[in-house]
Amino acid sequence: AACDQVDILVSFITHSGVRKLLDVLQTATAIGADDQPRTRLRIITTTYTGATELRALDELARLPGCEIRVSLDGRRTRLHAKAWLFQRQSGFGSAYVGSANLSGAALMGGLEWTVKFTERGQSDLFEHARAHFETLWEDSEFQPYDPANPQHRRALNEALRQEAGQGVMAQPTYFDLQPKRYQQ
């Protein structure tokens, strides 16, 4: 396999972004001769601002060997990181860290920056990125998502609706503002 495991950390995942990469991801995660996915795929994302799309996660979850974890509380966990770690048992892993979410706009037309570093060339940095991903993966803030589980679907759908501002009545905020002496 070109890669043994891919770990993806992005704030938002949209259907347009998944469609751009689906063929590559299907090839990478295809079942091999040993009846196992050739590449394990782990994804961490959020419901922050309601930008992640349910159907995008559903499509990814159908890939063999794909596991997804989602923070359902966009107000508490403001994950803004974007990183892709390609891990290889050979020790020739690589990572891409930048500004692009997994969306069509970011992948195709956005003005995004991405930096690549390698396990061999920048081993400390690569290990730090890998360890940070593992820490987030094990954090209970990021809940497993299985589209076949009705509770998971309901919780994710509700979190996305709330983050997008649907069905939530905005509470007015009142301030007692007083100008500073130099502002009068």
Regions found by a protein language model. Name each.
Residues Q184:
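Pre-Walker A adenine-sensing motif
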Residues A1-R181:
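PLD/PLD-like phosphodiesterase catalytic module centered on the HKD motif
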